[in-house]
Curated annotation (Swiss-Prot):
Native source organism of the sequence: Epstein-Barr virus (strain B95-8)
Compartments in which it is found: Virion; Host cytoplasm; Host nucleus, Host nucleolus; Host Golgi apparatus
Protein name listed in UniProt: Protein UL24 homolog
Matches recorded under InterPro entries: Herpes_UL24
Keywords: Host cytoplasm, Host Golgi apparatus, Host nucleus, Late protein, Virion
Region feature Disordered, mapped onto this chain: 194-248
Length: 248
């Protein structure tokens, strides 16, 4: 383990303070990650995706693929974006979330997130470069890394950094990269993210089960019921009188 990289670069005091974060804080961070994934899947255009990730200005890609929690060696990349058209490019994205609305660079948590996030991105890129099937005669794919700090509630970008990678190309084909990422991403998580969520408009209206309209009777006022009761008594006295034309 390189003592100058990742959490190893923190002092003993800062490292102990970072590891002492309450479980509720860590759980909130995990939930924010899942919301980031769902948000990315809901975006329909590259402009929307680039805005959410605060990517630098560049070409407008017309087709791209998303992969989540991809196991790359001993690291897990939060998200890998593979842009396909007009030319292939790979973005490795690491999310770090905060409860505050500012990414205070002096806080122990921010320093730890920055150090660990940068190490994660570099390790993921190195693993991809050595593990993807090489293609002879191919110029390879350009690879970039993005460390994105988000607010846990609003998912607003607080800060974004683009760590420098040792090599900026992956010596492989687009097909080879997509196949590997499909196998290495968390399939159960992806299935859960892809599952359609019921909406208020999608619910079927409740069907009221009750008597048919022909079976409904109107409420009769008390005075009218009294009058009808008297009429019924008179009819009882007339039992035995057969009306002409009546059939049994």
């Amino acid at each position: 383990m390189d003592p100058t990289r990742g959490l190893c670069a923190l002092s003993t005091h800062d490292l102990a303070k970072f590891h002492s974060l309450p479980p509720a804080r860590k759980a909130a961070g995990k939930r924010a990650h899942l919301r980031c994934y769902s948000k990315l899947l809901s975006l329909k255009s590259w402009e929307q995706l680039a805005s959410f990730l605060s990517l630098p200005p560049g070409p407008t890609f017309t087709d791209f693929r998303l992969f989540f929690e991809v196991t790359l060696g001993r690291r897990i990349a939060d998200c890998v974006v593979v842009a396909l058209q007009p030319y292939p490019r790979c973005y490795i994205v690491e999310f770090k979330t905060a409860m505050s609305n500012t990414a205070n660079p002096q806080s122990v948590t921010r320093k730890a997130q920055r150090l660990e996030g940068t190490a994660q991105l570099c390790d993921c890129a190195n693993f991809l470069r050595t593990s993807c099937p090489p293609v002879l005669g191919s110029q390879g794919l350009e690879v970039l890394a993005a460390l994105v700090f988000k607010n846990q509630r609003s998912l607003r970008t607080l800060q974004v950094e683009f760590p420098a990678l040792g090599q900026k190309t992956l010596p492989t084909s687009t097909t080879g990269l997509l196949n590997l990422l499909s196998r290495w991403q968390d399939g159960a998580l992806r299935a859960r993210l892809d599952r359609p969520r019921p909406t208020a408009q999608g619910h079927r209206p409740r069907t009221h089960v009750g008597p048919k309209p022909s079976q409904l009777t109107a409420r009769v006022p008390r005075s009218a019921r009294a009058g009808r009761a008297g009429g019924r008594k008179g009819q009882v006295g007339a039992v035995g009188q057969v009306c002409p034309g009546a059939q049994k």
